[in-house]
Structures are given as structure tokens and as C-alpha cells.
């Protein structure tokens, strides 16, 4: 992507304080911007200060993540994406167009796992007001298709960013999300046509593997194949956003 700066937000108390001791973050710190997230500080001077009791209320991590993406994009603008997403194509053409979310199969609301909002835009300001009013940031609350004020928020097909979510189709390299981390062999073979992330779901902009945080890193897997490729790109000092 052109002139892109990648920010990794880490909770100030649980994550950011371990930046120097975390080997995975240490190897990335010169290539991306690692930023501390303290919601109490971030809502100062914003409309969210009016609902600080809701913001600070006990929530599960998913709900906190829903709050985070709206607050951060309101303040800074940009493209939010979940960390279980792998980019397959340059997003530049999408970022030059409308602000967007993507469809969540047949649900009557959009998925905000990938969400592009511009700072101080009509849609961004409206979503901030809606969050204040509803005191909830879940996608079925904020991104309900019945909300006509979101008519100009582009809703891309699910297959653009989540090609396996709608189910397996003949020719796909995977039939289950966990297959992304599965070792090749015993009837599960790598497709001969896939030797790069560029050939993995070539019609999609991204692949969303949906959690699997406890999956083992297997070298002889699709994850291992692409992990080596991305490491090589980084080690060769190429632009990490150059797709």
C-alpha cells in the first residue's frame, strides 16, 4: 500500500510493558509503530468521555475490541483489522474509495473485523454518536443494514476478506479454518499451484482464519509457507506493505 504506516496497539497494562522482552515484537519494532492503548487517556477530549462509565465497565475482550475500533478510528482514522487476518492484495484501490465494512454472510448486519473509516467523516462521527446513544459497539448494533444513515458505508462481499466463511467450494485450498495450520501429508496435500500467499485465494484481498490462537506453528503447512515468505520479505528490507 502506498505510504502506509502500520500501528500495533497494545493494552498499556497487559502487553505494551512487555514490548522489549517479547521476541516477536522485538523483531518488528523497527518496521511497525507499536503504540500503547490506555482507553482512559484516549477518550479525553472526545465525545466518549460522556459515557466513560460504559467505556470502563467490565466487558469480555471481544466487546472491548468493538469499543476500541470505533474510538481509535474516530480519533485517528484509518484501516482497522483483526490480528487473525492475512493480507493477500494491496488495499490501495479500496482505500481510495468509500469507507467500508464487509458483509457477514446472510446476517442483517456487517462485519467490522476489517473496517475503514476516515477521521472526522460524516460516517465516523455518526458511529461515535450511535455508540454514545446505544452504549454498545457490537456489529449487530452499529452496523445494522436497516440504518439508512449508513447508506454510504460501502459493504463489500464477505468473499473479499473472508473467503472460507461461506463454506468450502471446489478448488479451494482449505475446507476448514484449522487447515491453515495443518501439516501437509496423510491426505492433506499442498496444492501444487500455491507457492506464495499471492496464489492463496487469488480472488480475495485477505484471508481471515478466525482465532486458532492456540494452534501450533507447523513449518510444513500453509501458515509455515507464508510465514517464511513474509520473513524473507522483511529480512530483505523490502517494504512490508509492498504486495
Model-derived features: where do they sit?
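Glycosyltransferase-associated regions of secretory-pathway enzymes
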Residues: 1-65, 83-243
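Small-residue hinge/turn detector
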Residues: 67-76
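Active-site acidic Asp-centered loop
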Residues: 76, 81-82
Amino acid at each position: 500500500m502506498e505510504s502506509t504506516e502500520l500501528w500495533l496497539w497494545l493494552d498499556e497494562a497487559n502487553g505494551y510493558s512487555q514490548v522489549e522482552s517479547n521476541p516477536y515484537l522485538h523483531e518488528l519494532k523497527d518496521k511497525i509503530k507499536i503504540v500503547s492503548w490506555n482507553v482512559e487517556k484516549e477518550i479525553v477530549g472526545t465525545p466518549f468521555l460522556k459515557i466513560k462509565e460504559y467505556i470502563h465497565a467490565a466487558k469480555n475482550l471481544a466487546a472491548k475490541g468493538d469499543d476500541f475500533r470505533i474510538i481509535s478510528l474516530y480519533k485517528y482514522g484509518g484501516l482497522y483489522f483483526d490480528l487473525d487476518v492475512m493480507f493477500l492484495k494491496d488495499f490501495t484501490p479500496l482505500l481510495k474509495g468509500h469507507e467500508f465494512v464487509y458483509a457477514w454472510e446472510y446476517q442483517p448486519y456487517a462485519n467490522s473485523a476489517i473496517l475503514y473509516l476516515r477521521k472526522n467523516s460524516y460516517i465516523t462521527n455518526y458511529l461515535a454518536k450511535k455508540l454514545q446513544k446505544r452504549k454498545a459497539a457490537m456489529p449487530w448494533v452499529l452496523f445494522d443494514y436497516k440504518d439508512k444513515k449508513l447508506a454510504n458505508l460501502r459493504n463489500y462481499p464477505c468473499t473479499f476478506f473472508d473467503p472460507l466463511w461461506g463454506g468450502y467450494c471446489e478448488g479451494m485450498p482449505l475446507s476448514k479454518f484449522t487447515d491453515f495450520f495443518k501439516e501437509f501429508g496423510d491426505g492433506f496435500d499442498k496444492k501444487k499451484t500455491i507457492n506464495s500467499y499471492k496464489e492463496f485465494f487469488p480472488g480475495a484481498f485477505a484471508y481471515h482464519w478466525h482465532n486458532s490462537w492456540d494452534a501450533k506453528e507447523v513449518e510444513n503447512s500453509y501458515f509455515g509457507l507464508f510465514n517464511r515468505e513474509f520473513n524473507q520479505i522483511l529480512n530483505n528490507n523490502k517494504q512490508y506493505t509492498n504486495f
